[in-house]
Amino acid sequence: MKNVNLFAGIILFLSLGASPQVHSQDFGPLLVSSTPLPANLSEYVLDFDRAVELGKALFWDMQTGSDGLTACATCHYSGGADTRNKNQAHPGFSGNFTRLGPNATLTPSDFPLRKLADPDEATSAVIWDSTEVIGSQGITKQDFNSIDLDFGGDANEVDDCSGIPDPLHSINGTNTRQTTGRNAPHAVNSIFYVDAFWDGRARSEFNGVDPSGLGNPNAMVRKIDANGNIVPCGVSMNRAALASQSIGPPLSGVEMSGLGRNWNDLGKKMCSVTPLALQTVSMTDSVLGTMAVSPGDGKGLTTSYVDMIQLAFRPEFWNSDAIFDNNGAHIGNGTPEGPNQFALMEQNFSLIWGLAVMCYESTLVSNQTRFDQYLAGNPNALTPEEENGMDAFYSGGTKCSKCHSGPLLSAATWGQLNTDTDVGIGPVVSVGTNADDGFGDKGFFNIGVRPSGEDIGRAGVGDQTWASRYFNGSTSALPGPVHPDETISGANKNIGAFKTPTLRNVELTGPFMHNGSQATLLQVVQFYTRGGDFTHMNPGDVHKYVNPIGKLNNKLPRQEAMVSFLKALTDERVRWEMEPFDHPELLLPNGHFGTSQAVAEGGVNSNEALDDIIVLPAVGAAGRTEINHPPVKGFLDTPSGAPANPIGPLGGGNLDPITELVCFEQEQKIVLNWNANTNISSYIVEVDNGGIMGVETFMVSGNQTTFEYNTFRPKTTLYLVTPYYLGMELKSAACFVRQGLTPGTLTHFLRGDTNLDGMLNVGDAIGLLEGIFTGALIPCEDAADWNDDGALDVSDPISVLGYLFSNGPAPAAPYPNCASDPNHDQLSCNQANICQ
């Protein structure tokens, strides 16, 4: 409840001057053909399809981790993200855990990490605040000694490592798995980013050795020249950020590796193990199925990584008997012996890994969403609530699409780099903040999640940011030209800026933000409603498009409509892990046996906690339904909406002040009906249409429970009803009507009139029973759906008979007059003029 000046808001008719709506139809659906890949990929990759096979195997293989359990997929297993709920906390900037800790189990009540008394007001009382981050657990802290080879030269899945005491990630002296200081970005659609990681430190120009691209001029691989000699070879591949990104985590002492492991070590290990030897692979896997070991015969693939590499890569990068030492020096020819001698294939493993994983991830494109159907011309692909949320998303009132632009809904993608958008053209752009103007890298924005000094984000990339390269005169190292219309002056605004992520499949990829601070999409919408958490403290750092959104403030139905739109960005193939999102089995460490106060020992090294393992079963091309497995769930499996809002003495106990709000088209007008559950002085009815929230506003007396609106508005309109009592704003409710592009489009019917004779009688029950049990035609399914639950079942004819003969309840609206269906569902009417 909030105090308001009723007289300032009571206007019979108000047309708002708003910026023009940005229509989503300004671009088309996402096309697989637009997937960016390096132009010179064929100089290294011999067979793209074989490279995809190799990349998928490497991405999912747990043997890549020094612990024999941590794969790339471990942090990207669920819709491309990491939704584990135990041992995921990192202390963040302060270096000390405050509310959470090692092995803590996350619950919905832990979020958001900055809790305010009013989630729509950034300056309201702070209930709690923490620098903590929800990251991804990697491996325990340990030094790498060597890979562990047996006498036959086969590698153990667990490396020879020595545990290191870890005062940060431990409980009573027992080490727990370390956790990253940022939340894991989701992998699906990541091929489209210009630079990768939250700060973009994985560069678009791949150097074959590390993530830094042109930032490492000494990066070299080895190659066989035309004369058969082994020579150093620089690698330069544009549009290859995923190759740069993929070679970071495997050597990270937090994520996957013992400290000190090198790429030739990992190459030797993987060339000495059976691919996916610890994991079942479905015989119907869309990529690996033909190589999968038959059920009952073991696990893994029937081939070797050596064979897979030879089929995928050009021979000049592996076909040699040269032997190299730990430092990459050519020390002879023949067969490498022991863990410290390496073949050319093993010496070039960073190149092989990076390109193979990039090729695999380039196939993970989710372009079969209902949003894509809408963009392709299907106006009914979205529900009315989703369409209204989309209109708000693309409106000048919220400014969401300024940064979340294009078919990927991200300004950090190749398709948006040189596109004229409201956040600039080209890699280096003018950046307006809430205080002054400056410059920064396009697609990276400070949105006020935390104080800028806690994590400087893009600025941490140093002299390799695009802005720094531009000022250093290294314009040839930019991913595109700087546009002459951009004013590049003032302060550097890369401080605290992070990559704008795609919003596709976002309902599955929580927790949200670079620090994992929001658990639900509603919390994200409320974050933007209040204009970020620290905009008022760091106005000179936070982008000008992040500021309070008044029309969303205390208007939960509008916020929920935006959440509904975001859910329409989910590709059902991702939800059900259908091709190309199928995968091998994966054993997932989800914290340790015990609590945040005490853990059981039992890790690989002494003084390490015993892992609590979750088994993700292997899935084939047909997805989870093939193995009778439920769909992928979001983080904590938390509903995106808010719980029921008890509003105290003014709200009638636990009931909302108004309930059962419905709206429908009746004759040439829109009718709203609702129930009032408490004393109400007045109502404000707002009409949202075309992306303008409150295009018209009306005052209604508190003793009314109905409202009529006589203006036709095309497409979808939201009707927001906000009750007031003694100057206090209570919880609002909303309903939606989609009237089409022209008047008279909606079908009108009388609820319960199954046979369309204009009245309710026993014939309606008989006709409905025949339809349910014999398949007889039901001319208007909506009319037959007595309780408007979106389904036809035996309860509907029973309710008809109960109403006719036993004084049972009347049907849902529309009744007793003909009108349109108040609720959007999958039922339909085969006749358009039923009531005429």
Positions of predicted regions on the chain:
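Short strand-edge motifs at loop-to-beta-strand transitions and within beta-strands
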Residues: 705-707
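Extracellular low-complexity, O-glycosylation-prone stalks/linkers
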Residues: 679-697
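Cellulosome-associated attachment modules in secreted, modular CAZymes
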Residues: 19, 652-654, 735, 739-836
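Beta-strand-rich modules
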Residues: 709-729
